[in-house]
């Protein structure tokens, strides 16, 4: 095919072909790995062009220098991109005039070496200095000034106009003036083209000179600058006339973007078409003009008329990068390459207007979570709406909700879901099957209220959907208000407080701290669906009902950023959230009665505490001031005893055998082990060995101000429990935390999973003076730090909570800590930073618990808004604690 010119720009090389080409006249730009490859391609093609140059020579000659006097204005028409100019292979011409010198391989090599540097300008320049010297008079030599100016201008512009195309610079010539052309004034070539290529060598000038000055070809060699040499200078053909008339290539143009339109028709039409308007006449003359450009030595570069070629104008502006969708092609095809828009947006608008009717894609992907591209048209973009893809387990086919207001703003009402539409997005996250996870919208609250529902209660809203999919629970699905981006706000779930306890779990993670749901979304996450969620028995709290006043802020979920997806660790107990920033104060009308235990026993693995008052899992040290002195009626059967029956009686601390905090009903899956502050010496003899031994925190007032955590020694009464109850309770007890009911939970985290050793993560009690241990001061997590269990604690068992505030102690199920075996570590004395106060309103209500026996003063029936903690220990307890220490 007829290659008019070739060139390269950076990692693109291009070939301009004539009308004879199969594709019709146009340029082919090809991207290659790097500029070196592009240059090589350019040169290779150039050599081939040289070989063929003879046939073109006449044409290029036709433009001889005589034309110079009448510079033929050759628009850059070809240079749509100015890059073409390099490609403009004035090769034909050059070959003919300069063929010897230009052709010389050396020249070529030099040219290439300088190619990036070498500028067509040099061709311009070539005429410049040296040429003027030899040929000063000759029309061919452009005035030095012109060449220089051109050169400067050229340097400024990366691509020479297509005009250059005709000239094929002879690389060699440029490099060495003498080499450049026999004629060449070597000096001229050297001096030639002040253009960037100058440094190269005036290769061109000499070359052009070598040709008859009149011969445009010579100059065209300069033009050849299109070859790898620097486009800017080369941008214009050296030919004076071409320089004069050729619109100087604009440097800016190099920066222009190539239209990358997909459609081939586009491509063909596009470049030409887009530039056509400006170069219309040129197109007709395309080939001819190309050849015609000759340097008119007369013209000074300044005179060069810059006529904006279409390419230039379009190039100046950004070419639209519209992806042409087949649908839009037609519209794009016509408009896409219209160069008139200075900003791509304009083009876009234009195209969009045309195509919008059928193709609404505006090229922008809606990022709003709820809003998915509405278009059923080609879904080029993946909807980022979380509901469409994120929920791993259950992907509800994303429903394109038009929750966008007329202005295109997505409604952020959280209630519906993260997405504006309040459809079963919640379901998806909450797992429709497991309605429990999803939280019912708070009564009276429309799921899609305009205002975001900040209450975290929405079931595992924050937790990733998988977390939500715990287990199916028979519970009405509640829409989850999942704003994943939003930190959990506390939705107060109102629990029906049968006991009248005010405590509301503010925990965002679960709609309720229902016994079923693990204490928090996090716990649920970690716990996965371990526990078959059974409806709670004897739970005073009905999930549907919620107290208006949240009395409790649970850190558990809040500590965890709702935004972070949680990975379910089904087997592992979730680490307690590191932050114990909030004090969990629970105002319980009554201490939950041990009677709840039976229900607890029923669940093989209880993830959540049943205690009606305290369905919420408390992560903070739960200080039940009451001393459980109830007689140990807690028998093996007690697990099955009716709730009203006191499940556990606390034996005197001396015996320690039966003193265990009553299990609060169903296995409470409190994440943290509650530590009994009371003198109550929890003897979990009744508790199956699997049950964690209760740790009682004994405050040795004499010894230190810090709460001392010692695990109560369990008397060997344990056998008293019937094996059946053991089996049933064992698992439940594993999951349930000891002393969940009353004991202060010191963030001790007990692994609920039966297969793992339950772990108690203990946060050390801060000293009463209020000195707050810095988290860094945490006690070491070595097993020895707190000897919680008589059984060996493997190093792996002891895990340090991420927050350094917690000590994780793994209690092996079935191991019962003996009080003597447990010695409070110094650290533990300093331990608890956060205290969860359960003010039992009515300890007396517990049959088995004699509040009077406990040295602890219990708040009067009226809940005091402020909790006073009195660490009263019976003297026997105190002495006992001291002795233990």
UniProtKB/Swiss-Prot annotation:
Positions of region (GRB2-binding): 582-584
Molecular functions per Gene Ontology: insulin receptor binding; insulin-like growth factor receptor binding; phosphatidylinositol 3-kinase binding; SH2 domain binding
Sequence motif YXXM motif 3, location on chain: 364-367
Post-translational modification remark: Phosphorylation of Tyr-582 is required for grb2-binding.
Keyword set includes Phosphoprotein: yes
GO cellular component: cytoplasm; cytosol; intracellular membrane-bounded organelle; nucleus; plasma membrane
Positions occupied by motif YXXM motif 2: 318-321
Residues with the Phosphotyrosine modification: 257, 364, 381, 409, 582, 620, 672, 834, 866
Residue span of motif YXXM motif 6: 451-454
Listed Low complexity bias regions: 61-75, 99-109, 176-197, 205-217, 516-526
Motif (YXXM motif 9): 706-709
Presence of keyword Translocase: no
Ranges of residues in domain IRS-type PTB: 1-56
Placement of sequence motif YXXM motif 5: 409-412
A biological-process GO annotation: insulin receptor signaling pathway
Region of interest (Disordered), ranges: 56-225, 263-282, 293-313, 501-581, 637-665, 732-803
Subunit comment: Interacts with the NPXY motif of tyrosine-phosphorylated igf1r and insr via the PTB domain. Binds to phosphatidylinositol 3-kinase p85 subunit at a low level in vitro prior to phosphorylation. Binding is greatly enhanced following tyrosine phosphorylation by insr and probably occurs via the phosphorylated YXXM motifs.
Functional description taken from the UniProt entry: May mediate the control of various cellular processes by insulin. When phosphorylated by the insulin receptor binds specifically to various cellular proteins containing SH2 domains such as phosphatidylinositol 3-kinase p85 subunit or grb2. Activates phosphatidylinositol 3-kinase when bound to the regulatory p85 subunit.
Descriptive protein name: Insulin receptor substrate 1-A
Species the sequence originates in: Xenopus laevis (African clawed frog)
Taxonomic path: Eukaryota, Metazoa, Chordata, Craniata, Vertebrata
Gene of this entry: irs1-a
């Amino acid at each position: 095919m007829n290659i008019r010119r070739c060139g390269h720009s950076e990692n693109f090389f291009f070939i301009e072909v004539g009308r004879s080409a199969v594709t019709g006249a146009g340029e082919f730009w090809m991207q290659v790995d790097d500029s070196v490859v592009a240059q090589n391609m350019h040169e290779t093609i150039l050599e081939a062009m040289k070989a063929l140059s003879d046939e073109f020579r006449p044409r290029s000659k036709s433009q001889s220098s005589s034309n110079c006097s009448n510079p033929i204005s050759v628009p850059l028409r070809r240079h749509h991109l100015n890059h073409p100019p390099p490609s403009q292979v004035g090769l034909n011409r050059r070959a003919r005039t300069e063929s010897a010198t230009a052709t010389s391989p050396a020249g070529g090599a030099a040219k290439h070496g300088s190619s990036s540097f070498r500028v067509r300008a040099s061709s311009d320049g070539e005429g410049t200095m040296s040429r003027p010297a030899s040929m000063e008079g000759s029309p061919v030599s452009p005035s030095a000034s012109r060449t220089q100016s051109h050169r400067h201008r050229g340097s400024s512009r990366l691509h020479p106009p297509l005009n250059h195309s005709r000239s094929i610079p002879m690389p060699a010539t440029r490099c060495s003036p003498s080499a450049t052309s026999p004629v060449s004034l070597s000096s001229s070539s050297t001096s030639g083209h002040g253009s960037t290529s100058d440094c190269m060598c005036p290769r061109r000038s000499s070359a052009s000179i070598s040709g008859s000055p009149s011969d445009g070809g010579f100059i065209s060699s300069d033009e050849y600058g299109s070859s790898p040499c620097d486009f800017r200078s080369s941008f214009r053909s050296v030919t004076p006339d071409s320089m004069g008339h050729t619109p100087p290539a604009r440097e800016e143009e190099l920066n222009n973007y190539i239209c990358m339109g997909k459609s081939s028709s586009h491509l063909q039409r596009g470049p030409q078409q887009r530039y056509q308007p400006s170069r219309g006449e040129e197109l007709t003359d395309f080939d001819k003009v190309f050849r015609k450009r000759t340097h008119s030595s007369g013209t000074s570069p300044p005179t060069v008329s810059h006529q904006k070629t279409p390419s230039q104008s379009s190039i100046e502006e950004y070419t639209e990068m519209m992806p042409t969708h087949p649908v839009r092609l037609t519209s794009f095809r016509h408009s896409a390459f219209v160069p008139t828009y200075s900003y791509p947006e304009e083009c876009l608008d234009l195209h969009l207007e045309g195509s919008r009717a059928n193709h609404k894609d505006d090229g922008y992907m809606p990022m709003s979570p709820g809003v998915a591209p509405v278009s059923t048209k080609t879904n080029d973009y993946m909807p980022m709406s979380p509901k469409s893809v994120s929920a791993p387990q259950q992907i509800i086919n994303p429903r394109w909700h038009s929750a966008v207001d007329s202005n295109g703003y997505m409604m952020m009402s959280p209630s519906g879901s993260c997405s504006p539409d309040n459809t079963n997005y919640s379901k998806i996250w909450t797992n429709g099957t497991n309605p429990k996870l999803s939280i019912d919208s708070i009564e009276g609250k429309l799921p899609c209220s305009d205002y975001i529902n900040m209450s975290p209660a929405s079931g595992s809203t924050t937790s990733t959907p998988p977390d939500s999919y715990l287990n199916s629970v028979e519970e009405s699905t509640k829409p989850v208000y999942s704003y994943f981006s939003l930190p959990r706000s506390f939705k107060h779930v109102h629990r029906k407080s049968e006991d009248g306890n005010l405590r509301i779990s503010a925990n965002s993670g679960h709609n309720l701290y229902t016994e079923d749901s693990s204490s928090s979304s996090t716990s649920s996450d970690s716990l996965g669906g371990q526990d078959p969620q059974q409806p709670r028995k004897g739970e005073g709290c009905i999930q549907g009902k919620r107290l208006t006043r949240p009395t409790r802020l649970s850190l558990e979920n809040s500590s965890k950023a709702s935004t972070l997806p949680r990975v379910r660790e089904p087997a592992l107990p979730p680490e307690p959230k590191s932050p114990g920033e909030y004090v969990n104060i629970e105002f319980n009308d009554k201490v939950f009665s041990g009677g709840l235990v039976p229900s607890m026993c029923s669940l093989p693995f209880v993830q959540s505490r049943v205690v009606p008052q305290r369905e919420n899992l408390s992560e903070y040290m739960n200080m039940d001031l009451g001393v459980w002195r109830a007689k140990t009626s807690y028998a093996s059967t007690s697990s099955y005893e009716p709730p009203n029956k006191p499940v556990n009686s606390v034996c005197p601390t001396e015996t320690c055998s039966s003193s265990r905090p009553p299990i609060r009903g169903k296995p409470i899956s409190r994440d943290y082990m509650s530590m009994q502050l009371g003198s109550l010496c929890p003897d979990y003899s009744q508790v199956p060995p699997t049950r964690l031994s209760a740790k009682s925190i004994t405050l040795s007032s004499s010894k230190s101000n810090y709460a001392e955590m010692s695990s109560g020694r369990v008397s060997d009464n344990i056998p008293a429990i019937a094996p059946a109850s053991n089996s049933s309770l064992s698992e439940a007890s594993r999951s349930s935390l000891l002393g969940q009911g009353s004991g202060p939970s010191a963030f001790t985290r007990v692994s609920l999973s039966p297969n793992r050793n339950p772990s108690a993560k203990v946060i050390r009690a801060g000293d009463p003076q209020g000195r707050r241990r810095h988290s860094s001061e945490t006690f070491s997590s070595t097993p020895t730090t707190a000897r919680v269990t008589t059984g060996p604690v493997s190093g792996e068992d002891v895990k340090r909570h991420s927050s350094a505030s917690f000590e994780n102690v793994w209690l092996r199920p079935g191991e019962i800590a003996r009080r003597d075996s447990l010695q409070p570590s110094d650290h533990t004395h300093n331990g608890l930073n956060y205290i969860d106060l359960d003010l039992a309103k009515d300890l007396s209500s517990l049959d088995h618990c004699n509040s009077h026996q406990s040295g602890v003063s219990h708040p009067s029936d009226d809940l005091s808004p402020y909790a006073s903690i009195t660490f009263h220990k019976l003297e026997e307890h105190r002495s006992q604690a001291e002795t233990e220490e």
